[in-house]
């Protein structure tokens, strides 16, 4: 059974926003589910262009600390600690941290 330990996890820092993405799911395990932890700096913004896909990708965002705004297409949701948003990745998505405190959230993706 694959296990992901803290020392084995990889992370990536976006040079533009300072956002840190850490892969939580065990690497090299064939699963349709991925878990990622994100540390999102105060004042940061990250946008993803998503459109029509061959297969459906679902994502849930669960805020652990702080607050963020998520815009999917033209709809914006404000999320605080312990809020969880479920969405299909079929439209552009923008994440914003409009506060003066870093936010931390968990992303669960299923494809």
Where are the regions a protein language model picked out?
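A short hydrophobic beta-strand segment most commonly corresponding to one strand
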Residues: 35-38, 86, 100-111
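Short acidic/glycine-enriched loop/turn segments that link adjacent beta-strands
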Residues: 31-32, 56-57, 88, 101-102
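Short, conserved secondary-structure segments in the cores of folded domains
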Residues: 36, 49-50, 59, 75, ...
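Short acidic-glycine-tyrosine-enriched beta hairpin
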Residues: 24, 73-90
């Amino acid at each position: 059974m694959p296990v992901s330990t803290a020392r084995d996890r990889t992370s990536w820092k976006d040079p533009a926003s300072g956002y840190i993405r850490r892969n939580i799911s065990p690497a090299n395990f064939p699963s349709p589910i991925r878990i990622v932890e994100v540390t999102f700096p105060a004042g940061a913004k990250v946008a993803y262009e998503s459109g029509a896909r061959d297969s459906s990708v679902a994502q849930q965002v669960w805020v652990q600390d702080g607050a963020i705004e998520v815009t999917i297409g033209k709809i914006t949701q404000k999320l605080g600690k312990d809020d969880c948003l479920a969405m299909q990745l079929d439209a552009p998505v923008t994440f914003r941290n409009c506060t003066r405190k870093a936010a931390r959230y968990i992303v669960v993706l299923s494809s």
